[in-house]
C-alpha cells in the first residue's frame, strides 16, 4: 500500500485493512503492480466519500485477498467484458482517459503468477476484486 499512498491521498480515498496477516509465496513486485491497477480503478471510479477495504483470509491452503470499494460500480451488462483487451465501459468513456488495458493487463499478470482474479460489482454501490493466491510450500508475508 505504501507505493500507492500518494494516489490514495490525492484522491481522498480512505483505506481500511482487515486480517492482512496471511502469507503467500509470489513475486511481490508484480503483485504490487497488480494491486496498483485495482487501486487506480477504485480511485478513478470513486464515490463522494470513497473507502477501499483490503482484507485477506485463508481458504484451505490458498489465500484470498479482496479489494473492495464503495464507488460507482460497474453496470451488470458490462461486467463480463471488463477483462477484455481494450474494453472501456460506459463509466470510463464518460470520464475520459481510460485505455481499456488496466484490467486486461491485471488479469494476464495474475494468470502468469497463477493467481485467480475475479470481479463482482453492483452499479451505484461498488466493486469487489478478489485475488485467489495458489497454495505454495514456501510462504512470505503478504
Regions found by a protein language model. Give the residues of each.
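Conserved micro-motifs of the catalytic ATP-binding
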Residues: 23-26
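Short helix-loop "hinge" at the ATP-lid/N-box region of the Bergerat-fold HATPase_c
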Residues: 41-43
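Short beta-strand/loop element within the Bergerat-fold HATPase_c
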Residues: 49-61
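Acidic ATP/Mg2+-coordinating residue in the GHKL
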Residues: 69
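Short conserved segment of the HATPase_c
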Residues: 74-87
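Glycine-rich ATP-lid/hinge loop adjacent to the conserved G-boxes
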Residues: 87-97
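Conserved glycine-rich
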Residues: 114-115
Amino acid at each position: 500500500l505504501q507505493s500507492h499512498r500518494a494516489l490514495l491521498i490525492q484522491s481522498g480515498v480512505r483505506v481500511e485493512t482487515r486480517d492482512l496477516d496471511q502469507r503467500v509465496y509470489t513475486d511481490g513486485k508484480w503483485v504490487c503492480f497488480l494491486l496498483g491497477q485495482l487501486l487506480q480503478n477504485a480511485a478513478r471510479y470513486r464515490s463522494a466519500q470513497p473507502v477501499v477495504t483490503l482484507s485477506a483470509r485463508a481458504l484451505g491452503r490458498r489465500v484470498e485477498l479482496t479489494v473492495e470499494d464503495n464507488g460507482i460500480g460497474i453496470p451488470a451488462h458490462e461486467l463480463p467484458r471488463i477483462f477484455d483487451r481494450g474494453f472501456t465501459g460506459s463509466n470510463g468513456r464518460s470520464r475520459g482517459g481510460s485505455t481499456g488495458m488496466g484490467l486486461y493487463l491485471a488479469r494476464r499478470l495474475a494468470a502468469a503468477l497463477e493467481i485467480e482474479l475475479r470481479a463482482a460489482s453492483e452499479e451505484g454501490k461498488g466493486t469487489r476484486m478478489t485475488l485467489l493466491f495458489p497454495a505454495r510450500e514456501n510462504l512470505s508475508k503478504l
